[in-house]
Amino acid sequence: MKISLKTDIGQKRSNNQDFINKFDNKKGITLVILADGMGGHRAGNIASEMTVTDLGREWVKTDFTELSQIRDWLFETIQSENQRIYDLGQSEDFKGMGTTVEAVALVESSAIYAHIGDSRIGLVHDGHYTLLTSDHSLVNELVKAGQITEEEAASHPQRNIITQSIGQASPVEPDLGVRVLEPGDYLVINSDGLTNMISNDEIVTILGSKVSLDEKNQEMIDLANLRGGLDNITIALVHNESEDVE
C-alpha cells in the first residue's frame, strides 16, 4: 500500500482548520486520520489537531491486527475523544469547537474505517468512484428524505450544517465499515474542501494519470484551488498497487 497525505489552506481562508497524519501501531498497522475542524478563533485548528494527535497517540500503543479489535477500538476511542473535545469546548476560548473525523486502518488488503461529519472516504475501482461514507449533514438528511435533490444540496444555504461532530454534547455514533482493496484500487479520504470544488469523475481522471501518488494528490489540490479554493483542502490517497508494479 502506498499512501500520500497533503493539506492546503486554499484561497479564501486565513488559517487551516484541517489536520491529517498517519500512525503505525506495534504490529505495523497504519491508521490514517483526517479531521476538519470548526469553531471561531483558533478553536477549529485545535479541535482537528487534537483529535488526530490523541487518536494517533493511543493507536501507537496497540498491537491489534484483527478487524474486530480495530473496529471496537475505533468506536470506543472516538467516543472518548468526543467527550474530551466537548469538555474543552465549554471554556470561553474554545466555545463551539468541533471537528469531523475519518480514521482508516489498513490491514493487509483491507481498510476498516470510522466516519463522523461531512469529510468523505471514497473508493476508486476500475475507473469508477464509489462513496463509502454518508455525510452527517443537514442537506444529506433532506436528500435522503426526498425533500431536495443532490444538485440542490450542492448550493443549499445550509449545506455547511453538520449533524454529527467530535465535540458534541451527546455521544457520537460513528459509521463503521470495512472494504477490501483489490490490486489497482484507490482510497480517497478528504475534507469537503475537495469535493465541493471538483467532481468524482475528475478525481477518477486524475488518479488514472501516469504520475506519482504525491503528484496525483497535488493535482487534485491545484484543481480545487483553480476553481476558487473556498475552503481548506486535505487529502489522503491510498493505493493498493497492482501485483506487477515493482
From Swiss-Prot:
Stored SMART domains: PP2C_SIG, PP2Cc
Matching NCBIfam families: Stp1_PP2C_phos (NF033484)
UniProt-annotated binding residues for Mn(2+) 2: 36, 192, 231
PPM-type phosphatase domain segment(s): 2-240
Keywords, ordered alphabetically: Hydrolase, Magnesium, Manganese, Metal-binding, Protein phosphatase
Name listed for the protein in its UniProt record: Putative protein phosphatase 2C-type
EC code(s) of this entry: 3.1.3.16
Organism in which the protein naturally occurs: Streptococcus pyogenes serotype M6 (strain ATCC BAA-946 / MGAS10394)
GO molecular function: metal ion binding; protein serine/threonine phosphatase activity
Sites where the protein binds Mn(2+) 1: 36-37
PROSITE patterns per UniProt: PPM_2
Reaction(s) catalysed by this chain's protein: O-phospho-L-seryl-[protein] + H2O = L-seryl-[protein] + phosphate; O-phospho-L-threonyl-[protein] + H2O = L-threonyl-[protein] + phosphate
Entry note: cofactor: Binds 2 magnesium or manganese ions per subunit.
Lineage summary: Bacteria, Bacillati, Bacillota, Bacilli, Lactobacillales
Cofactor: Mg(2+); Mn(2+)
